[in-house]
Amino acid sequence: MAGHSKWANTKHRKAAQDAKRGKIFTKVIRELVTAAKLGGGDAGSNPRLRAAMDKALANNMTRDTMNRAIARGVGGDDDSNMETIIYEGYGPGGTAVMVECLSDNRNRTVSEVRHAFTKTGGNLGTDGSVAYLFTKKGVISYAPGLDEDAVMDAALEAGADDVMTYDDGAIDVFTAWENMGAVKDVLDAAGLQADSAEVTMIPSTKADMDAETAPKLLRLIDMLEDCDDVQEVYHNGEISDEVAETL
């Protein structure tokens, strides 16, 4: 598959994301502890843990910090009763938004999530209101510069579902979310260094953002990501290069 690069849509947010590094670490540690607590400390048989480990390493977390978090979960040293909660809603410009949370207090979490939607002109929906528009997938991303044919051949041989190449040479490899770790291992062994690997929700349709709605969508995402209980924000908003340059 060929397509338009997502890199332009994300690069203008990198500085803000870097500023949130400390908060990201806290959230990744929480996910590591929870994944290990629920599914055990073996990443080979616990795809949720493997995905959390890949995210931790992508954010430059040390293996020592990561292993301590896993040990906390496996050893039962963490006495919090965290549960995964998914909220669905509509953002600026009719965007479909899914918010994945880890929380020990539903009332606090839903209040913060609803506030973010309301402040940016969106609204929190009911269960199932937008979930049907998304599919859970593993995505292994490669920065421009690699041999596209080499990545594609290795990915498909490793059992990937699909490979998308972009105009600027960036490449995304899509997998069943449970198989992402195994596919990445094969690609790593082939000498193909990924820029990132994550489990995400892929939208089946896109909502084009213009110069008016794009800033509102980005504000919604930032407000949600600032909530301590929010782990991930997924949406189907599409920001063109032209609009991104104005932000």
Swiss-Prot record:
One of its GO terms (biological process) is regulation of DNA-templated transcription. GO terms for molecular function: DNA binding. Gene3D superfamilies: 1.10.10.200, 3.30.70.980. InterPro entries: Integrase-like_N, TACO1_YebC-like_2nd/3rd_dom, TACO1_YebC_N, Transcrip_reg_TACO1-like, Transcrip_reg_TACO1-like_dom3, YebC-like. Keywords: Cytoplasm, DNA-binding, Transcription, Transcription regulation. GO terms for cellular component: cytosol. Residues 1-20 are annotated as: Disordered. It is found in: Cytoplasm. Belongs to the TACO1 family. NCBIfam families: PRK00110.1, PRK12378.1, YebC/PmpR family DNA-binding transcriptional regulator. PANTHER family: TRANSCRIPTIONAL REGULATORY PROTEIN YEBC-RELATED, TRANSLATIONAL ACTIVATOR OF CYTOCHROME C OXIDASE 1. This is Probable transcriptional regulatory protein ETA_14870. It comes from Erwinia tasmaniensis (strain DSM 17950 / CFBP 7177 / CIP 109463 / NCPPB 4357 / Et1/99).
